[in-house]
């Protein structure tokens, strides 16, 4: 697949992260590591990783308007479909491949995770928890529970995935869960790796650090 690469042309913008998972992800990334952010949006996470730990970060984003936003901020991005472009990268191209709220938008999540494990030495995934107790109450009331706070008719398709669902998938695919951090209202809780029921019920989201 032909895609357009836009390289860094200016200083990385200095903007405070707006999401709690960004801070957790930044603590998981080693200083100076190479990073590929899948579905990087406006590049806020790339900027944070570059600024906070000197990461050699680049993004992959399908939306051309968001790519332009990244370029305006002096960030290195590749424009193209994530699942197709991932297959084009050589094995072990990056220290980390990151899905920050983008994994649930993948058309083929299993294949996307497999390719990420091939391309990256480690994979970081932050997932919105569809199994949160508030979402369960909404379903009991006959309502569709939004995964990210948006109306169900707005934005790209997002797959309903609980914390336990993702952990099960990762283990089925022979990934090791190095650590997993639950977040509620943007604030991290106690790390978990094996005991999932509490996070599956109470966490708004969780960030997983995986090794293939």
Region spans (language model):
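Class I SAM-dependent methyltransferase SAM/SAH-binding core
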Residues: 44, 48-85
């Amino acid at each position: 697949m032909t895609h357009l690469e836009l390289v860094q042309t200016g200083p990385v913008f200095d903007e405070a992260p707006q999401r709690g998972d960004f801070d957790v992800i930044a603590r998981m990334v080693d200083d100076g590591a190479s990073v590929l952010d899948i579905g990087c949006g406006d590049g806020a996470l790339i900027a944070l990783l570059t600024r906070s730990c000197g990461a050699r970060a680049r993004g992959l984003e399908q939306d051309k308007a968001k790519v332009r936003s990244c370029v305006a901020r002096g960030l290195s991005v590749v424009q193209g479909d994530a699942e197709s472009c991932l297959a084009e990268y050589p094995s072990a191209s990056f220290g980390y491949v990151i899905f920050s709220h983008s994994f649930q938008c993948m058309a083929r999540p299993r294949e996307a995770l497999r390719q990420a494990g091939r391309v990256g030495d480690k994979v970081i995934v932050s997932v919105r928890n569809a199994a949160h107790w508030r979402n369960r109450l909404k379903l009991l009331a006959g309502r569709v529970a939004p995964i990210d706070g948006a109306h169900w008719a707005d934005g790209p398709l997002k797959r309903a995935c609980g914390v336990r669902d993702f952990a099960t998938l990762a283990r089925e695919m022979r990934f090791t869960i190095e650590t997993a951090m639950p977040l509620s209202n943007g604030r991290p809780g106690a790390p978990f790796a094996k005991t999932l029921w509490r996070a599956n019920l109470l966490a708004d989201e969780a960030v997983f650090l995986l090794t293939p």
